[in-house]
């Protein structure tokens, strides 16, 4: 479950998960068969099957390894010939868990941001040695492992050594992750400033405000109508991952969104950039209405793209995540 920069747990993320039975209710065998179908031809273009078609557990609001029915869910997908990819911190569970996943032949991206002396600065409450051990167990059982590395100022000097280690341990791939998480203050569970990641702190030793105040400042900035972003351009060039990849995001409570960038809990989540979505989301719980009906509101997001700016009602997260103008 996510917290804010290492501080207290975000009360906007209720603790929940999909059981194997619920998962099968949403993703029926018929839907799974359609997931693996090639993209239909357009004009003279032949039908295309993308290498990443399948189901990805991306850890948007938690870690796959926390799900009690995780292995059973993966086994269900594999039984229907669906490609499975998992992103995880990889610091939980006994050896048998990782061996079971390895024998299923799935892909797991292990988030390993440096060596033992740097990894914990961002991946708080994880044990680097345990992550490496779990990855080795998974690889030995036949799994395809990817070393996912976020470059920070504090670990860039270790990237070459990490790449060499990944190759030596049998990782199939080493991937740099560029997702904007490479800077900002980090806090303890008690909300006390711990350390700073990146280059946004002044050169003199000045601590940031306590984390609750930072969040409140962000919300005030949004609510005041002064919200601005460099990608909120007059003309948009949106590369929508939902439209391009036929992507759908299903949250752990069964609610459905066009993509993980828009995935949230509308009644409680404190992310100010998602506040306008509360008016758009309607009847989107697939456990209640089925997957197709839960997707019926998606076009209302695209309608906001015709507005002049985020201030005028454009979907903030679409602009920030997908505008290439």
Regions found by a protein language model. Name each.
Residues 315, 319:
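Residues immediately within or flanking Cys/His clusters that coordinate Zn2+
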